[in-house]
Design a protein with these regions (language model features):
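N-terminal helix-rich structural modules
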Residues: 1-130, 142
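Well-ordered beta-sheet/strand-loop patches within structured domains
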Residues: 53-54, 135, 139-173
């Protein structure tokens, strides 16, 4: 489920690569989450693909800087929102938990199930709070629970953390 979300954020539908013949090109596309070589400044390595969109799929590919700057929405720089076009063609924000609702629900249920199996109260607390956070895009309480997880031998981090895919504003995770 997390992998599906990452594909959606990085490229879109990965089935175009699954349809490629078995071989190095297909394998490399699957490793790179798309046709761009992450180790070579995102240079395309599959014919027919141009430069990687700077905003990955966090923003509409045709959005201009001026259009984004003029977009008056306090959530536009929130790390847990996507920028999409409404039916009227205007920009709008969409929460991750709405865009990826089906995947988020499955992930949250897996975390809740795992919480019933752990013997560490701090881990259980983190897993339950993170499940709630994924469903609401409010990560503050679960981040505090993560910091309180001092008795675990695992450093368990689940959810949107890194923002390096966002080459436009550097905020979307």
């Amino acid at each position: 489920e997390v992998d599906h979300i990452y594909w959606q954020q990085s490229f879109g539908d990965k089935s175009v690569f699954e349809a490629l013949p078995e071989g190095p090109e297909r394998s490399y596309a699957m490793i790179n989450y798309g046709p761009w070589d992450r180790l070579d400044n995102n240079a395309p390595f599959i014919a027919g693909y141009g430069e990687r969109p700077a905003g990955a799929r966090f923003y509409p590919e045709d959005m201009t800087r001026e259009e984004f700057d003029a977009f008056d929405d306090p959530l536009k720089l929130n790390p847990y929102t996507l920028i999409r076009r409404g039916e009227d063609g205007k920009l709008k924000t969409v929460w991750y938990h709405e865009e990826y609702a089906e995947n988020i629900d499955k992930i949250a249920r897996y975390l809740e199930s795992a919480a019933t199996m752990t013997i560490k109260e701090s881990v259980r607390n983190y897993l339950l709070k993170r499940a709630d956070a994924l469903r609401t895009d409010d990560y503050y309480e679960s981040d505090l629970a993560w910091m309180d997880m001092k008795d675990s031998k695992m450093d368990l981090v689940i959810g949107p953390i890194e923002d390096y895919e966002d080459g436009i504003n550097g905020v979307k995770t």
